Amino acid sequence: MFSGSRRGLFLLEHFSMWLFGHYSILIVLIMFISILAMMAYYARRLRISEIVVISSLSAISVAARVLVFIPFFKPCTAVIIISGSAFGPAVGGMVGVLTGLVSNVMFGQGTWTPFQMFCWGSIGAVAGLLHLKKKWSAVLFGFFMALIYYGGIMNFYSMLTGGTVFNIYCYLAFEINGIGCDLIHSCATALFLWLGWEPFMRRLERMKTRYGILR
């Protein structure tokens, strides 16, 4: 007879095996959540000023990803965090979702796109909820969110699509294999936040005043 903990592990293992065989369900679910979040935001009555801000920041974030040619050394996560911190979770989340969707027109669309949309959208939303004010707090937030959160979810996606088994050991193997890329991404995010936080926030504060946008 199984103990409570062993029964839980037994059920988790069998659920994991089922999920590994039906990972497309998870991909569709994440895509649905990401698109639903976008639709829910746009369903409300938007002012022209809000559309201008979202479009402008999304264009900057997409350009930051496309025009920097060093693999994984991209400023877009930093731009998303700054957007959320300046304008709140709704704008930060939308900029993140659109960054993943639009930039992959250049990099290629695939089953990874909804995962990236979800990661960047939630990072922008959390940055907005935290209302980051200090540069150091933004740098630390960006470093760990890029390394642990974004990297963890994308490594999980890699395991779903490229792994032969589905368990914690397989996941750790993908984490170890991807640690170099994740460190480049997290260090780039921290560096661009350190260099761009103050000048970027000053310009966004003027934009908020100009368009009369309040958090």
Where are these regions (language model features)?
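Membrane-helix interface segments
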Residues: R47-E50, P89-M94, K133-A138
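Hydrophobic transmembrane alpha-helices
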Residues: F2-I81
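Generic transmembrane alpha-helix motif of multi-pass integral membrane proteins
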Residues: I35-M39, C76-G92, A125-L130
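Interfacial aromatic-anchored transmembrane helix boundaries in multi-pass membrane proteins
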Residues: V62-T77, V97-H131
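Membrane-embedded alpha-helical hairpins and interfacial helices in multi-pass inner-membrane proteins
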Residues: M1-L29, T113-F115, L129-R215
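Transmembrane helix irregularities
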Residues: A63, L67, A86-F87, C187
